[in-house]
């Protein structure tokens, strides 16, 4: 919460992301601090990263599947008063049933683009169809001809 309070004089900060692994107590404190400090500041809870697969989640000690963990994290975001969550497109359908706030989706790839190091990717149109309210795009836009890639994105969305 001290970090949030330190942002009070900085203009044009709309979102702060916080990982769900921070735990309920920390998440609630951050949400409370954001409300006191800046009424426009929106807290987005980050769920399981798109670079993590079910096999790698087990290797780091989790016994539940990614789908189960993300559902728990969506309930946590709701219970703690978060404005939104960040989740992979592959998790959108189950999350949308639980969480009604903003849902930001990373790991977006245009048709034909490599997933690279990302394990759980989805196309932009499918992400919006499945409940995403905003996309995070990097490689599909900046690799190669940016102008051409933006045109590809627009075509995919139409």
Model-derived features: where do they sit?
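Catalytic-site microenvironment of enzymes
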Residues: 32, 36, 151-158
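A short pocket-lining beta-strand/turn micro-motif at the edge of beta-sheets
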Residues: 82, 101, 131-135
């Amino acid at each position: 919460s001290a970090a949030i309070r330190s942002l009070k004089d900085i203009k044009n900060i709309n979102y702060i992301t916080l990982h769900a692994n921070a735990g309920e107590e920390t998440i609630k404190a951050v949400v409370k601090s954001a409300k006191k400090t800046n009424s426009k500041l929106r807290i987005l809870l980050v769920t399981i990263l798109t670079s993590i697969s079910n096999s790698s989640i087990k290797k780091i000690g989790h016994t539940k599947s990614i789908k189960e963990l993300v559902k728990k994290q969506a309930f946590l975001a709701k219970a703690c008063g978060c404005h939104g969550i960040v989740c992979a497109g592959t998790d959108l359908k189950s999350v949308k049933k639980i969480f009604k706030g903003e849902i930001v989706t990373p790991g977006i790839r245009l048709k034909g683009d490599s997933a690279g190091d990302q394990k759980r990717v989805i196309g932009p149109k499918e992400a919006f169809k499945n409940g995403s309210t905003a996309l995070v795009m990097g490689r599909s836009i900046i690799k190669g001809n940016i102008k051409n890639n933006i045109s590809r994105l627009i075509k995919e969305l139409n």
